[in-house]
C-alpha cells in the first residue's frame, strides 16, 4: 500500500471510535470511494454490516449506533419515540423496560435502510412513520420536543417526555391501554407547560390532542392549569376511540366503561 493510501487509512482508523458505524455516503464525502472501501474490507480493516454501512473489523455495534448513523450521516428524522422514549426519561418507572423492542419513529415519509432492517441488533425495531406534527417543526430542536441521550456508545436524538407521550397516545387503543396511559400521565409531574402548549398547537391528530387533555385534566398536575386550551384546535364531533365505552362530553371521546362518564 502506498504512503498516501496508508496515511488515509491511518487517518480513518484513528478517527473511527469504537462502537460507531460509518455509512458509504459519509465515507465517500470524506474521500473514501468504492476502491478504498473494497481494499479496506479485503484487508480486514472494516466489515460491512450490510449494503452501505460499515464497522471496524471485530467491533460490536448497537441499534443506537445505527440510529446515530442515520441521524448524523444520512439526514434522517428517525428517532426513539413513544413508550421507549418515555422509559428513557424515567417517566414510567413502574414499567419494566422492554429490552427486546425499541420504538423508532419519523414525522416524515421515509424508510429504514435495508442494512438497518436486516441486521440482528438483538432488539426489535418497531418503526413507524407518524405524521403527528406539522412539518414546520424542525427535527432535533429542543424547542420542538426533542432531547439527546447517550447510550451504548452512541449519542442519539429522542423525543422529550411531552412529545413522547403524544406519540404514545397515538397507539391507543390498538397497542396501548387506557389504564397504562393514565398511569404514565400520573408520572408526568414535571412536564413543561410551554412545551406542552407548543406541541398541542402543532399536533395534527384530534384524537391524540383530546386524549392528552382528557388524561391531563383527570390527573390535574399543576402544569395543566397553565395551558391555554382556547389556542388548541380540538375539532368538532365525537370520536369513538373505545367501542362500547362512555362519553367524556368535554373532549368528545369515548373512554372505557369503568370511567365515570355518560354511557354512549
Feature-to-residue mapping (PLM):
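N-proximal short alpha-helices
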Residues: 10, 58-59, 134-138, 154, ...
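Sequence-level motif detector for i,i+2 pairs with an aromatic at +2
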Residues: 19, 99-100, 248
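Hydrophobic alpha-helical interaction segments
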Residues: 139-264
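Short gly/ser-rich loop at a beta-strand->alpha-helix junction or flexible surface loop bordering the NTP-binding
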Residues: 24, 38-43, 48-137, 253
